[in-house]
Design a protein with these regions (language model features):
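Membrane-embedded helix-loop-helix hairpins and adjacent transmembrane boundary segments
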Residues: 1-582
Length: 582
């Protein structure tokens, strides 16, 4: 069966363009021409807690969240939600420790605090690690929606990357931090409205005799609703232990030391506003991620009762199907369709037996259903192997295409345009927050550090911040143009963060709690800890014992940095210890 691509019509384009251009123009116009660096980088400290909370959420919730997480739920179930179990505690710690210090010192960036507490080289190291990892992540956040949208909508990938990148550069450079926060508020409104619409339509499109209750039971029987895994196996990426411990340190570093988030809440009108904004996220983040994963699990059930492609990246599939591998791929497609029909019948058999309250019959029907699912999935793996045989560089990770395929196939025109706007809005919101933070850090921690005489020239500072913001936007576009990712995109983002975040968090924990440790000790400790994490990551394929969940990198990097700092402080000559001053 050939699955044709549905294209957007005039109504979809009108909805998309009005939504996106309206949001960008609104933010740029209302925050144009900030004359002071404080206004450009912090929004003049007038932001209320609601805007802070939404801005913090929007900076984290990129298009990857709304493209990749439903695919994660579709493919692996809702267990990914464990990744966020440590987040509420992390935000409480940020509110109690990090935020008051940043507010008291009046810093523009988190790394200014490191310079005051330690020395300039430690400040530059912290800023450098942030710029490196966030610069890479910015490339992923622009690559993610571009590759999906270009594939589904027929746009050229390079032009899609450049177009979305330039749009976000324009309004971020024009208005600075205030523009980012203001536009993110409207973007999140579009996002929530669009996702709720998709959830409702998906529920209505389920078979009438099934309903939401039946769909949930099928998802559970298929292993898609296992939210908590107590396994002690270190090879498993997502367990309650990686979520509570690894996720705690990942979230603590991200919200406490990543300038893309710090900049969102230090611009609050008061300490209370920043705290309330963060608590808003502590309460809503897990339910939001759970809902998006559940949407993916329900998509899995939906496609059990609909004709489903053997490979969800349909443009990629059709490209190879029209080539020398066409006969093989068409045979696999027919085989998959036949097995998919068998699987559907086994599911209906299981549903019928469930009503009879016969445990033995239910168990047998369930086993038959799972065997049919395994057979269908085996053909999908055969298809991916065939694609790789045709081209070793073929992208076989197709879970990111499931939700966008559902949008294009199943939703009415107008709603399609709205949900495509959701994807782009999420991309722009996250990208704007990242670029704003990269420009701020480059200006404050690099340019003003090496050009101290320019620190008092407000016009020059704002101009430099704008140029750095635009420069990082161009770097991110360039990285996105030449990058390729084999991981699920939401995992790619978390892997990049986990490689760096633990060490950066370790530096800050030493600064906060180990008052006797000096700058030289923590500097070399951080270098050693980061080297250790690089070794663990790049040697994991050579040494299987090192191939454990990437979330543990956060805990290992942090513990190594703190431990090495204490050791070096004990053996190095005594160093002067600074006390930060407001």
């Amino acid at each position: 069966m050939v699955f044709a691509l549905v294209r957007m019509n005039t109504l979809d384009w009108i909805v998309l363009l009005v939504t996106m251009v309206g949001i960008a123009a609104y933010g740029a116009w209302h925050t144009r021409h900030p004359g002071h660096l404080d206004t450009y980088l912090k929004g003049d400290k007038t932001t209320k807690w609601g805007t802070i909370g939404i801005s913090v959420m929007a900076t984290q919730a990129s298009a990857i969240t709304f493209l990749s997480i439903p695919g994660q739920g579709f493919e692996s179930g809702i267990g990914f939600v464990q990744n966020y179990f440590g987040l509420p505690l992390a935000l409480i710690i940020v509110c109690a420790v990090f935020l008051p210090i940043y507010r008291k010192l009046g810093v523009y960036t988190a790394y200014e605090f490191l310079g005051q507490r330690f020395d300039s080289k430690t400040r530059l190291l912290g800023a450098g690690l942030f710029l490196l990892q966030r610069g890479l992540a910015a490339g992923v956040t622009i690559y993610a929606p571009a590759i999906i949208l270009s594939t589904v909508l027929g746009w050229r990938l390079d032009l899609t990357i450049i177009g979305t990148g330039l749009l976000v550069i324009i309004y971020t450079v024009t208005g600075g931090s205030a523009a980012v926060s203001l536009t993110q508020k409207w973007q999140m409104g579009v996002i929530f409205g669009g996702m709720m619409t998709a959830f409702v339509i998906l529920t209505l499109r389920l078979p009438q005799e099934l309903g939401l209750d039946g769909a949930v039971h099928i998802a559970g029987a298929m292993g898609k609703l296992e939210a908590v895994d107590f396994s002690m196996n270190p090879d498993k990426r997502y367990t309650i232990w990686t979520g509570i411990f690894g996720g705690l340190f990942l979230s603590l570093s991200y919200f406490g030391t990543d300038q893309s988030q710090v900049q969102r809440y230090i611009g609050g009108a008061a300490l209370r506003e920043g705290r309330l904004g963060l608590m808003f996220n502590a309460l809503l983040k897990i339910p939001m991620q759970f809902s998006i994963l559940l949407l993916g699990a329900l998509l899995f059930v939906f496609y059990q009762f609909q004709p489903a492609p053997v490979f969800y990246n349909r443009v990629e599939w059709q490209h190879f199907a029209s080539g020398p591998a066409g006969a093989t791929l068409q045979a696999l497609e027919s085989k998959h369709a036949a097995l998919h029909t068998v699987e559907r019948e086994k599911i209906r058999d299981w549903l019928a037996v469930r009503k009879d309250d016969d445990a033995a019959a239910e168990s047998a029907a369930r086993a038959a259903m799972l065997d049919a699912r395994a057979a269908t999935e085996a053909v999908r793996q055969e298809a991916k192997t065939a694609l790789l045989a045709a081209d070793p560089h073929a992208k076989t990770k197709d879970s990111d295409y499931v939700f966008i395929g559902f949008i294009m196939d199943q939703l009415p025109h107008g709603v399609i345009g709205l949900l495509i706007a959701v994807m782009i809005a999420a991309s722009l919101g996250s990208k704007a927050g990242e670029l704003n933070a990269l420009g701020t850090t480059s200006t404050i921690d690099l340019w003003r550090h090496f050009r101290p005489l320019a620190a008092h020239d407000e016009v020059r500072n704002v101009r430099a911040a704008r140029w750095f913001t635009a420069l990082w936007g161009i770097v991110a576009i360039a990285f996105a143009l030449f990058a390729g990712f084999s991981e699920n995109l939401i995992e790619a983002i978390n892997i990049i963060g986990s490689i760096f975040y633990g060490v950066v968090l370790g530096i800050f924990l030493v600064a906060f709690f180990l008052k006797r440790v000096g700058g030289t000790s923590v500097f070399w400790a951080a270098v050693a800890a980061q080297t250790l994490i690089f070794a663990l990551y790049f040697l994991r394929h050579r040494f299987p014992a090192l191939d454990f969940s990437y979330l543990w990198y956060n805990l290992i990097g942090c513990a190594a940095c703190v431990g090495f700092s204490l050791i070096l402080q004990a053996i190095l000559p005594r160093q002067p210890v600074r006390a930060p001053r407001p």
